[in-house]
Amino acid sequence: TLVANLPDIKTESEKEVALPPFLIEKWKKEGRYEKEMASLDAFFKITGYPRAPKYYIIKWLTDYIVEFGIDGYRADTVKHTDEKVWAAFQKECNYAFGVWKKNNPSKVLDNNSVYTIAEVYNYGISGGQEFDFGDKKINYYQNGFNNMINFEFKWDAQKDYEFIFSKYSSKLNNELQGYSVLNYLSSHDDGGPFDAKREKTIESGTKLLLSPGISQVYYGDESGRSLVIEGTEGD
């Protein structure tokens, strides 16, 4: 599975660690060791963070924002990391975005901050701001995310239009006010999509695009491409 193959980086740790030798070797071969080390030194001096694994990752991801002006991140398998890391991540993303805007005034489109979306597997809008692990509940919205993928929408799509609109409007204008959800009907790792045979394409599109929240359009949603293909395996 995906999770079984993820790198075992201890995002909950605050313990300082050295860079892995293979990365140092790579940088030296590429002739950029001194530049990368100076950049790391500057980041840790400005932020005051310890040189723990998560802060290295935050630094490298926010470098993309400074260089390219990336204005959003979609984080995968969030439940398998320590939730507090994302608050620090969002903070540094917004700082980096400010640096990019200052350096590129002619390219600035608006005053928005970096937009962050969390994939917390099986989160549904009915849970409001919290995801229930069974033994604990975590509020990812208050730990650095503007939006969470809503795994519940494909089930709600089986209901009528009034039910969907009323439910989602109520949720997003009350306990989720200021935040949002990302709705989908089919996805690469969801084995039970709504209308897999694409027999309700107009209904699917209407519900997905007109329901409160953000819409994810998956490959084939727009063209009615069937998801039932004999002989296929995996994603």
Listing of model-derived features with the role each one plays in the protein:
Residues 1-63, 67-68, 89, 93, ...:
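Substrate-binding/active-site clefts of carbohydrate-active enzymes
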